[in-house]
Amino acid sequence: PESRTVLQQLRFRNNLVRARTRIANSLVAIALSCGAVRRFSVLTTKGRRRMAALKMSEEQAWQRDRWFEFLDGLEPVITEVERKLEAEAKKDPRVCRLMTQKGVGVLTGLALVHVLGPPERFATSRKVAAYVGLDAVESQSGQRRHIGRISKQGSRLLRFLLVEAAQTSARCDPELKAVYERLRRKKTHATAKVAIARRLLVRSWILLRDQIDIDEFRRRGRARCGVKPGQPEETHGL
């Protein structure tokens, strides 16, 4: 019941944010049709002033005002849901442990804990990746084996949050940044980003399974690779 409630809140928040994005895009479309040279954020005070300064027809102005009314109604609801989720995260040591990994915030941490459930039910990292749909689909033609796109089974919400988190991790986590840059030389940005999301997922599963934080995870990685404290870290698998 607890996991169901948290996941319902996460999905509700996600739907609200998607609605806000659709409204913002509709407002930008009005701005562009009224002579705006480039896209701009309509979610800021400055953006609203720019919208108000544009010359537009009476009908366009009416639509603009209605869209802003919808936005004004959404914002406090999004804020309220996010406060509930933050409170839930703060009291859960599992989420706090996951958030020691750069890129994993409140939303991703909660989704990981409540989608995966007990970490011991997954025997291997491949089973975790398959459960979330971040495993590569294999096909065979004659003597050739082809590894294609991810299967996209399981929780769409968790996959989305992990891919979003991967963008931050690829910038802020030295190990994952090195992996991303290496992959980016051979693959597309999207492929590299999904690969980082998969590594984040497996790391998170290990943190949950072993009840450790990211510092202990790295210490174990250095020990496994024979790297002494103070030496430059090499990427070590995950």
Mark where each language-model region is:
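Phosphate-backbone recognition surface of nucleic-acid-processing proteins
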Residues: 97-100, 106, 111-190, 225
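Glycine-rich, often acidic, oxyanion-interacting loops/wings at catalytic, nucleic-acid
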Residues: 5-97, 173, 218-231
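Hydrophobic (often cysteine-bearing) scaffold residues that line and stabilize catalytic clefts
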Residues: 19, 23, 70, 104, ...
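Low-complexity, acidic/Ser/Thr- and charged residue-rich accessory regions of DNA metabolism proteins
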Residues: 143-147, 179-238
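Short helix-capping/linker segments at secondary-structure and domain boundaries
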Residues: 23-24, 78-81, 117-121, 167-175, ...
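Short, amphipathic alpha-helical segments that act as regulatory/interfacial helices
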Residues: 10-20, 24-32, 113, 163-167, ...
